[in-house]
Each structure stands twice: as C-alpha cells, then as structure tokens.
Design a protein with these regions (language model features):
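Residues that recognize and position ribonucleotide moieties
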Residues: 34-35, 65
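A short, structured beta-strand/loop element
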Residues: 44-47
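Active-site-adjacent substrate-recognition loops and nearby beta-strands
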Residues: 1-5, 22-34, 59
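Active-site-adjacent helical/loop segments in soluble small-molecule enzymes
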Residues: 41
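C-terminal intramolecular chaperone/auto-processing assembly modules
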Residues: 3-9, 51-102
Length: 102
C-alpha cells in the first residue's frame, strides 16, 4: 500500500455546491477556457489547490495558485452518491404518498 491515513470525504455535496464554475480568458494569450478561480476553491476545499512556484537560480520569480483538477473527481463522485441517497429517499416518499392516496 502506498497510501495511509485514508479517510472518507465528508460533506462533498455541500462543497460542490459552494464551488463556482466560470468561463474566462487567459491573460497571456486570450485563450478561452472554463474552470474555477483557485482562490475561491481554496476557501471551500483547500486540498484541491496547489501553489506553483517558479524559481530562477534559487530565487523565487513567481508564485501562483492552481486548481488540482484531477483531485476534483473524487469529490464529484462522493457528491453524486450523496445526491443519489437524497433521490432514493424522495422516490420512496413519493411512492408512499401515491400508495396511500389510492
């Protein structure tokens, strides 16, 4: 095993609901893209943001935040599972109400 301290993701649906997807253009080349604003993601799920540092001759030249899009997948899967549990409960309630009305 390569991993340790494995913990389930909690509150995934709420976290996903607090993320804001945006469209934007990159400053360097005006290329259009969609995604998230790293600073906003950091407020909701800090583990999804990494700091990219660029150094030259051991001197920090630039530093910026970046969203780790690959890790969002696990959060989305858990959020979908939470949604499905809600859907299943609502379907059961609807069925119970329909059965009771007939």
């Amino acid at each position: 095993k390569l991993k340790k301290n494995i913990q389930p993701l909690e509150g995934a649906l709420e976290k996903v609901q607090n993320l804001r997807g945006v469209s934007f253009e990159w400053k360097k080349d005006d290329k259009k893209s969609i995604g998230f604003i790293a600073q906003e993601v950091q407020e909701v799920v800090p583990d999804l943001v990494k700091v990219n540092r660029k150094e030259h001759d051991g001197v920090l030249v630039s530093e910026h935040l970046a969203v780790d899009y690959g890790n969002i997948t696990a959060l989305l899967v858990e959020a979908m599972k939470e949604q499905q549990q809600i859907i299943n409960k609502l379907e059961a309630r609807i069925k119970a109400l329909e059965t009771g009305e007939k």
